[in-house]
Amino acid sequence: MTFQSDIEIARAANKLPIQEIGARLGIPSGDLIPYGHDKAKVSQGFIRGLADRPDGKLILVTAINPTPAGEGKTTTTVGLGDGLNRIGKRAVICIREASLGPNFGMKGGAAGGGRSQVVPMEDMNLHFTGDFHAITSAHNLLSAMIDNHIYWGNDLGLDARRITWRRVMDMNDRALRDMVVNLGGVSNGFPRQTGFDITVASEVMAILCLAEDLEDLERRLGGIVVGYRRDRSPVFCRDLKADGAMAVLLKDAMQPNLVQTIENNPAFVHGGPFANIAHGCNSVIATRTALKLADYVVTEAGFGADLGAEKFFDIKCRKAGLKPSAAVVVATVRALKMNGGVAREDLGREDVAALKRGCANLGRHIANVKGFGVPVVVAINHFTTDTEAEIEAVRAYAAGQGAEAILCRHWADGSAGIEDLARKVVQLAETPSMFAPLYPDEMPLFEKMETVARRIYHAHDVIADHVIRDQLRAWEDAGYGALPVCMAKTQYSFTTDAAIRGAPEGHSVPIREVRLSAGAGFVVAICGEIRTMPGLPREPAAEVIRLNGEGRIEGLF
């Protein structure tokens, strides 16, 4: 059989007009705003009309700590949605939009892979419906209005040394992390130090993903703290009168995007915060809409369960009042071997001993998910290099942790390769879920960070200097103490050191910086060396992406 790349499989898909996909969910064509023939936005009016409908079951797909290439979490999300439909269940998937940064960097796209993809794959991995452009524009409009306000007299008394709002762009570019703006003389303004973050780390992105409707969106935008006066009192976005214009830029972006899988099942793709430097979940409005339209909604949270799942439970579910019915932890033989000490270039060779060592990582994630009171099953995402002995070792280990591990071949076989997992998920979803967040709202902010570090990462302590602790206390005094925390750290390890694999115990978590996302409604703790503006690798994926002689894209995966 001839090997087909993801892009070749996606191009060969027999896509249906998006109106037919909408009709399957009961969405009238008049409530779809089409972007071409195969993607559309769903109108706010239609979504408002769903309020009184009962909710379906919410299924989270998460994973172990990944290799740099990822472990097929989105592929499994898509495959599981297709699998549930295959066994006669009405299912919808909800995933995030792709960022250009990793597309042209090292990780690749975010549309799934093989026979478990969302299409149109090329559009999704590039500009899609323009949501990221709108988010970037809204964010940078506020940035421009801050410097403009200072230029024209600074009536609000903003201290240029204490402006916390940076700029963003949807690209990995380490050169923009720190810079001085307004150089060039009096006509250009007052020089000050600032920098860029990647769009997926923007508070505007988080706000769009957590807002319930346009009114809530504008309220949250107005609540953004852009900086402080000399007396340390905050200056808000609404003080600059930027919130209305920002909401206008985001009006269409707030409408969820409807597309389809290769097997013509519906998929909402909306929002895209990273899980290592942001909260890592698709939009609340897309998830809630899907829950009103389907019996089962399958969604994913970025990277491993220590990041994406924890934030899904402690931020998204807490804020939106969602109650997941079951969780799937995706594991691959190769990632378990890497966690057991095998070098990346040797992952294709059988090594049961290393795999068993690496299974401690899987066990930690299973225990963490169970700690939230959610039933869990393990999906072994099959790779051609996996051996029967390795697969059986994973099954045996998971069984010892009280979770069934099911081999899934959805990448190669689509929904036919994941039926067993689909049936298990239905079974789990019928059992009582005792979901509860990790910590109460009233716990002090630093204690929340300690709770995540100790219970999820198994750290011994959290290191933060007096400046950070004083800042957290000041935010508590200002009324932000009930907010959840968003831990920004490497995705490759339970520690803040990407090189430490497995399931380490007793390490320290250093907090380098804290940021208040008052509009989004959480406090970010930046741990270790993680950056909110990534850089490109030595050999970025962009080097092999091109147009062929027929004007078709090559190299996008």
From Swiss-Prot:
Keyword terms: ATP-binding, Ligase, Nucleotide-binding, One-carbon metabolism
Record's catalysed reaction(s): (6S)-5,6,7,8-tetrahydrofolate + formate + ATP = (6R)-10-formyltetrahydrofolate + ADP + phosphate
GO biological process: tetrahydrofolate interconversion
EC code: 6.3.4.3
InterPro entries linked to this entry: Formate_THF_ligase, Formate_THF_ligase_CS, P-loop_NTPase
Pathway: One-carbon metabolism; tetrahydrofolate interconversion
Gene3D superfamilies xrefs: Domain 2, N(10)-formyltetrahydrofolate synthetase, Formyltetrahydrofolate synthetase, domain 3, P-loop containing nucleotide triphosphate hydrolases
GO molecular function: ATP binding; formate-tetrahydrofolate ligase activity
Binding of ATP, residues: T67, P68, A69, G70, E71, G72, K73, T74
Lineage top rank: taxon: Bacteria
HAMAP family, A to Z: FTHFS
Family statement: Belongs to the formate--tetrahydrofolate ligase family.
Protein name: Formate--tetrahydrofolate ligase
Organism field: Cereibacter sphaeroides (strain ATCC 17025 / ATH 2.4.3) (Rhodobacter sphaeroides)
Lineage, opening ranks: Bacteria, Pseudomonadati, Pseudomonadota, Alphaproteobacteria, Rhodobacterales
Gene: fhs
